């Protein structure tokens, strides 16, 4: 079992006043059914979740459960229940604890996610402002433009209302904001889900637009799009399981640029390990003086980074700074019918779980160690290494960035990562079926805990290189320019 903290094996998550604005077309769930679901959720999380009390005391967490129970004490539409559940799960402050878009029932998924309610362009949030990255054919909408308001609601207000529903570890709000970017990398976008549920619109929207180039203001009317249309805008063919996901290019001077936009390759039939093997052979043949690994936009998935680190080290690399912990040895029989997973070994850790105290067990991986080392592998790359990072990096990519920086294997360039130095939860999952409402909540099973006190933050790059609206307007990649400048000094 790998140490990466993938959101699922299958693929890939206010105010009550906002919730009541939802339409009545959604399925209704009676209070009696919701009370059963919240009791199940409470028992499962209090028994199995390793990070439940990382950022909340037991008393605080009990209060969160009580507030969810109160919200569900009256019947709700499934959309209202989904919002209440998502708001509750966000309070756990775990980047892998959410009502996973891809693990909902078909009926719930169709009802909640498939409507014609999505903005038709791509954008990212920069300094609290919605900045267009690609107009996607919307007339009079250009890269770098700011959407200052939608149907009269300011961009700042939209961001403020959506953030409480987004997932991230601890107080790493940069990750929460990054979750709300729409840049063509996700099959279902977090922004699309919560904006549609909280701010329902007719099939067109009025966009208040401000030009980054000259400050001119204008109003643009744009039609909303469906989930199918959103997926057609994606950067890669998501249905081709054989497509290469990584790419290798060489800049002048044979500087290698390894772009890795996604490590969620669980169902991929592409030989990604073979690609990395061949990439390092090419670097060796070309005697590349530097390697730039571009992880921007990559949340994580498999431990693909271990295959890269294996070529950067001359001896096996120990990962002793963090300890893996679980809350149980064997799952209670009464919970098993509600716990789906891809690997039933997660139901019984056996002798691999060694009691630490009344709350935790240490989970052993290899030779009595909590984490197996990364084994050195040739050919070793001896040149300069630069890794481009941003707030999306919150799971396996966060761990990779942390290992690279902590072991001085390379220079991190870009923006602070997601994840959290206080540890994250994942590695193995149950998909908790709340059968009465037809909703699901992801339940991570393995928590990593640092051996020494750490800040409540992601990894801060060695060199900060932030994207700006002007960069987007002009097509400039300032982070890559910075990385190439560092590489040129190799």
State what each model feature region is.
Residues 265, 351-364, 443-458:
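Extended, charge-rich low-complexity interaction segments
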Residues 458-470:
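A hydrophobic, small-residue-rich beta->alpha segment in the mid-to-C-terminal subdomain
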Residues 188-190, 198-200, 351-383:
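Alpha-helix-centered segments that form part of catalytic cores
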């Amino acid at each position: 079992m790998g140490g990466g903290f993938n959101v699922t094996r299958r693929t890939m998550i206010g105010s009550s006043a906002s919730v009541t604005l939802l339409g009545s077309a959604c399925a209704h769930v009676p209070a009696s059914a919701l009370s059963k679901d919240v009791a199940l959720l409470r028992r499962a999380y209090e028994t199995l979740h390793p990070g439940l009390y990382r950022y909340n005391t037991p008393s605080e967490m009990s209060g969160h459960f009580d507030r969810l129970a109160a919200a569900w004490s009256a019947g709700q539409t499934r959309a209202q229940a989904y919002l209440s559940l998502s708001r509750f799960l966000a309070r756990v402050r775990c980047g892998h604890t959410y009502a996973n878009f891809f693990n909902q029932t078909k009926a719930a998924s169709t009802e909640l996610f498939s409507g014609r309610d999505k903005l038709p362009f791509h954008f990212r949030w920069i300094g609290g402002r919605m900045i267009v990255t690609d107009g996607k054919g919307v007339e009079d909408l250009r890269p770098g433009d700011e959407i200052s308001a939608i149907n009269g609601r300011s961009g700042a207000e939209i961001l403020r209302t959506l953030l409480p529903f987004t997932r991230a570890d601890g107080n790493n709000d940069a990750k929460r904001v990054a979750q709300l970017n729409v840049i063509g990398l996700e099959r279902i976008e977090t922004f699309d889900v919560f904006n549609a549920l909280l701010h329902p619109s007719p099939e067109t929207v009025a966009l208040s637009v401000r030009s980054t180039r000259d400050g001119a203001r204008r109003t643009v009317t744009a039609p909303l799009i469906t989930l199918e249309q959103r997926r057609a805008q994606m950067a890669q063919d998501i249905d081709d399981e054989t497509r290469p996901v990584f790419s290798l290019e060489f800049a002048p001077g044979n500087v290698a640029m390894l772009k890795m936009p996604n490590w969620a390759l669980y169902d991929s039939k592409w030989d990604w390990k073979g690609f990395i093997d061949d990439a390092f052979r090419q670097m060796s043949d070309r005697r590349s003086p530097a390697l730039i690994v571009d992880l921007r936009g990559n949340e994580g998935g498999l431990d693909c980074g271990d295959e890269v680190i294996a070529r950067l080290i001359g001896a096996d690399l120990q990962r002793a700074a963090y300890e893996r912990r679980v809350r149980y040895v064997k799952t209670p029989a009464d919970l098993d019918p509600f716990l789906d997973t891809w690997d039933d070994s997660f139901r019984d850790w056996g002798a691999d779980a060694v009691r630490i105290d009344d709350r935790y067990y240490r989970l052993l991986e290899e030779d009595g160690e909590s984490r197996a080392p990364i084994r050195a592998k040739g050919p070793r790359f001896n040149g300069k290494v630069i890794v481009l990072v941003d707030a999306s990096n919150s799971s396996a990519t966060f761990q990779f960035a942390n290992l690279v920086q902590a072991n001085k294997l390379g220079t991190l360039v870009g923006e602070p990562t997601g994840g959290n130095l206080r540890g994250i939860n994942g590695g193995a999952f149950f998909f908790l079926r709340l059968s009465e409402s037809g909703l699901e909540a992801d339940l991570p099973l393995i928590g990593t805990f640092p051996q020494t006190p750490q800040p409540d933050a992601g990894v801060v790059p060695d060199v900060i290189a932030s994207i700006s609206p002007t960069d987007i307007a002009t097509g400039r990649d300032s982070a890559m320019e910075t990385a190439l400048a560092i590489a040129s000094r190799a």
